[in-house]
């Protein structure tokens, strides 16, 4: 009897520890409130999937992880604002012991069987003159390419070094790609960092 009680106590303590270790948690559901199972969620270091109740939890190191985000399943929309994908990530607050973040996904009206991936390598604009060229030369060229794939979903991605150490050029860049009519993702490059920041965490 004593062994059974001890085993139960250890199991209870372990369950409590696991719950406390989950520094980031939340739910993923659709716009009708239906829980979504099997959605991949990550903090950039750890990965998990939602359970049958749409719940996820991550034991995140908040000194390293700045965001929690998910991989949007193919039968749900990629939400965007003026061409910049959003709503698939949320910022973490390292001052809180527990971060709770819920996600809501919009089901597609029609299923798709594929998409076109448009990659742009290193725009690396260093001043307003180069940004003007990006806007007046690169953007029209991209629009022509996109028009060739009418009827298909097109997703763009800038593969880092969007500017050349010029943080003030990100806003003109976002304005430029907003006219493409497609979700435009961006990857950070070594020239997309604010090196004057004393904290490595705040350089991105």
For the regions a protein language model found, what residue spans apply to each?
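N-terminal active-site segment of His-dependent metallophosphoesterases
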Residues: 79-171
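Short, ordered, surface-exposed loop/turn motifs in non-cytosolic proteins
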Residues: 22-24, 30-45
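A short, amphipathic beta-strand motif
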Residues: 24-30, 54, 103, 196
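A short, solvent-exposed loop/turn motif at the edges and junctions
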Residues: 43, 63-91
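Bacterial N-terminal signal peptides
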Residues: 8-16
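Single conserved hydrophobic/aromatic residue that forms the stacking wall/gate
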Residues: 195-204
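Bacterial N-terminal signal peptides that target proteins for export
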Residues: 1-6
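Short, acidic Ser/Thr/Gly-rich low-complexity loop/linker segments typical of extracellular
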Residues: 45-59
């Amino acid at each position: 009897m004593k062994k059974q009680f001890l085993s139960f106590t250890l199991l209870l303590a372990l369950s409590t520890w696991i719950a406390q270790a989950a520094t980031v948690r939340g739910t993923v559901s659709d716009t009708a409130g239906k829980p979504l199972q099997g959605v991949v969620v990550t903090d950039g270091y750890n990965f998990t999937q939602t359970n049958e109740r749409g719940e996820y939890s991550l034991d995140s190191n908040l000194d390293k992880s700045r965001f929690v985000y998910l991989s949007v399943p193919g039968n749900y929309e990629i939400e965007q604002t003026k061409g910049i994908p959003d709503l698939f990530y949320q910022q973490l607050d390292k001052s809180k012991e527990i971060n709770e973040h819920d996600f809501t996904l919009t089901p597609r009206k029609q299923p798709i069987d594929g998409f076109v991936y448009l990659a742009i390598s290193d725009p690396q604009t260093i001043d307003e003159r180069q940004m003007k060229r990006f806007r007046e030369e690169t953007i029209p060229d991209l629009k022509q390419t996109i028009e060739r794939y009418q009827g298909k979903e097109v997703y763009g991605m800038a593969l880092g070094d969007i500017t050349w150490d010029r943080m003030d050029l990100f806003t003109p860049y976002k304005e430029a790609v907003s006219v493409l009519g497609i979700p435009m993702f961006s990857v950070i490059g070594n020239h997309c960092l604010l090196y004057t920041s004393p904290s490595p965490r705040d350089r991105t």
